[in-house]
Amino acid sequence: MWAYIFGAVCPRKGKGAGLVLPYCDTEAMQEHLAEIGRSVDDGAHAVLILDQAGWHVTPKLKVPDNITLMFLPPRSPELNPVENVWQFMRDNWLSNRIFKDYDDIVTHCCAAWNKLVDQPWKIMSIGLREWAHRS
């Protein structure tokens, strides 16, 4: 079995929405979009930056009305601020560990994500990009 962390952050507000799931496919992405949609403030709109993974671009996705998907060019993950979130989580909370079993992996993934979202200043620090705010 596998454990996948699906996560999105709002660097401006220091907020995050995430799920830990045993699969990485269209159904998982649909659950993630629903979670993000629920976390967007009333009257606000989120722009979700994505690579072009198959489960991101499938026409089967039903995107909530309060989310717009923005796709990066192929082979350019460095343009997505959330990649720095994954690197930070690996470097600080998830790498170089021995897990007892699958449940321990899921528990550590959930704990790492929850630790991140409990530190809004960390999300802001990792995710804000000067070029993203230029007019």
UniProtKB/Swiss-Prot annotation:
Alphabetic keyword roster: Plasmid, Transposable element
Stored InterPro entries: RNaseH_sf, Tc1-like_DDE_dom, Transpos_IS630-like
Gene3D superfamilies (UniProt xref): Ribonuclease H-like superfamily/Ribonuclease H (3.30.420.10)
GO molecular function list: nucleic acid binding
Domain of life (superkingdom): Bacteria
NCBIfam families: transpos_IS630
Name of the protein: Uncharacterized protein y4pE/y4sA
